[in-house]
């Protein structure tokens, strides 16, 4: 598979340790292992479909038992960056729970410092500067989460966010609402595991905590009506999630290990319905995957094209927990690294209105809600819901727009649904943001297909 640079937003440090390293560290720490060679240990570490949750989590318990010294943490952090960089990753956010590594006497601050040193060492040789996300464990008391947040706040800069992770059933994210709010007030981002092991009610609980991203989230499909492989209606939680345009950090192989085969994964249906999705490895060693393999699976089993993969990579860069200038540089690097061009946004307007607006050099649409809007940087284009806009209308022009030039849309960037309107998006759209203008009449029955020239449009005015 040939592809451009990848961005990883959901990767657990303890889930990606090389089996040979686990064996070395366990021997050094005097921790018993279920196998005496790396290959056999790798087979044992791999989570199998249908495995009970407690048995699956025992794999992490073994790894974490060996990660109780500064040197062990430094080593696995460095190796994680090496492995990700070798797979074509140019930005990574590694998450872990520092308080799970204090059994040997280290304080949480020492744990974070050891991991940071490992990241710094690998950055010198790979050029990949990874960031850290501190996990709160959802089954632990609020006081423990407060301690984790304290450590995260103290390490702001390299630590960019907090997460709520661990076993979902019986442990809603709202149990940690106080620590989450305190982290946000201190300037940290928030991502929350939800809808991975349990249903949409866990996503509702996560949304109540006002996250910036959702880990996994695929079980939101249980709050959708589906017919003929398409989402036909959204329930209240699904509507809230889509309307919020929150990124879903989808992990195909990891979900398959918990019983959802990749070929039956709803990620494409969710993208078609306007949800903001991306692909991530989750636990590279324990689920035997990599960022590259996640894209290969999406291509081979879900029919994702290279243009769509490039779009997901760009959007992951937009969703990264970085300062604005670093995010802009990352987006530019990712876009330049793919051999395909992704039309970011398409605005459909009456041709006369658009031509009149060009005379002034900017497009300031009145009554914007009368116009149609399509976002093309998802996995797939959403066709059916927009028919209400096209049916019976003629003399339309499709204006292919570069989202990165629209009213600081690099930071804001809307969701993916065609059935959405964003009157606040166009503060002032300069003609230099336009990539192409294409006549776009609907078909006689009101349905439409995106013409190839629209998909390939790259001409800048």
Describe the role of every protein-language-model region.
Residues 10-12, 193, 216, 265, ...:
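Histidine-centered active-site/metal-ligand motif
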Residues 1-188, 197-202, 207-213, 219-341:
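Metal-cofactor-binding active-site regions of metalloenzymes
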Residues 342-461:
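Conserved, structured core segments of small domains
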Residues 192, 227, 256, 371-375:
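Short, surface-exposed loop/turn motifs that are enriched in glycine and acidic residues
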């Amino acid at each position: 598979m040939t592809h451009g640079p990848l961005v990883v937003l959901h990767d657990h440090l303890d889930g990606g340790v090389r089996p040979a390293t686990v064996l070395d560290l366990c021997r050094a720490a005097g921790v018993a292992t279920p196998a005496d060679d790396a290959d056999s240990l790798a087979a044992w570490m791999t989570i199998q479909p249908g495995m009970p949750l407690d048995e699956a989590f025992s794999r992490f318990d073994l790894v974490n038992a060996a990660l109780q010294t500064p040197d062990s943490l430094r080593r696995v952090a460095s190796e994680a960056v090496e492995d990700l960089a070798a797979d074509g990753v140019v930005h990574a956010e590694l998450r872990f729970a520092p308080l799970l590594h204090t059994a040997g006497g280290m304080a949480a601050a020492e744990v974070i410092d050891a991991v940071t040193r490992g990241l710094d060492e690998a950055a010198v040789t790979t050029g990949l500067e990874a960031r850290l996300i501190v996990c709160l464990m959802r089954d632990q008391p609020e006081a423990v989460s407060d301690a984790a947040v304290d450590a995260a706040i103290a390490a702001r800069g390299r630590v960019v966010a907090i997460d709520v992770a661990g076993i979902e059933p019986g442990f809603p994210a709202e149990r940690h609402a106080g620590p989450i709010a305190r982290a946000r007030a201190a300037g940290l981002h928030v991502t929350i595991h939800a809808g991975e092991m349990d249903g949409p009610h866990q996503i509702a609980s996560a949304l109540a905590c006002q996250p910036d991203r959702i880990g996994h989230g695929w079980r939101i499909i249980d709050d959708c009506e589906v017919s003929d492989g398409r989402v036909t209606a959204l329930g209240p939680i699904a509507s809230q999630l889509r309307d919020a345009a929150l990124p879903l950090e989808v992990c195909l192989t990891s979900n398959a290990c918990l019983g959802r085969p990749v070929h039956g994964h709803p990620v494409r249906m969710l993208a078609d319905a306007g949800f903001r999705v991306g692909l991530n490895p989750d636990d590279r060693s324990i689920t035997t995957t990599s960022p590259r393999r996640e894209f290969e699976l999406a291509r081979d089993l879900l029919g994702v094209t290279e243009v769509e993969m490039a779009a997901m990579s760009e959007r992951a860069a937009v969703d990264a927990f970085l300062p604005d200038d670093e995010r802009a540089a990352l987006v530019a690097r990712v876009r330049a690294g793919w051999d395909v061009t992704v039309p970011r946004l398409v605005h459909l307007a009456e041709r006369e209105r658009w031509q009149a607006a060009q005379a002034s050099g900017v497009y300031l649409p009145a009554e914007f809600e009368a116009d149609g809007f399509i976002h093309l940087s998802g996995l797939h284009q959403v066709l059916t819901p927009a028919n209400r806009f096209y049916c019976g209308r003629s003399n339309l022009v499709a204006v292919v727009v570069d989202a990165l030039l629209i009213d600081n849309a690099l930071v804001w960037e809307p969701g993916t649904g065609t059935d959405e309107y964003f009157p606040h998006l166009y503060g002032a759209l300069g003609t230099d943001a336009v990539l192409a203008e294409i006549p776009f009449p609907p078909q006689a029955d009101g349905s439409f297909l995106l013409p190839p020239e629209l998909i390939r449009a790259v001409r800048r005015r």
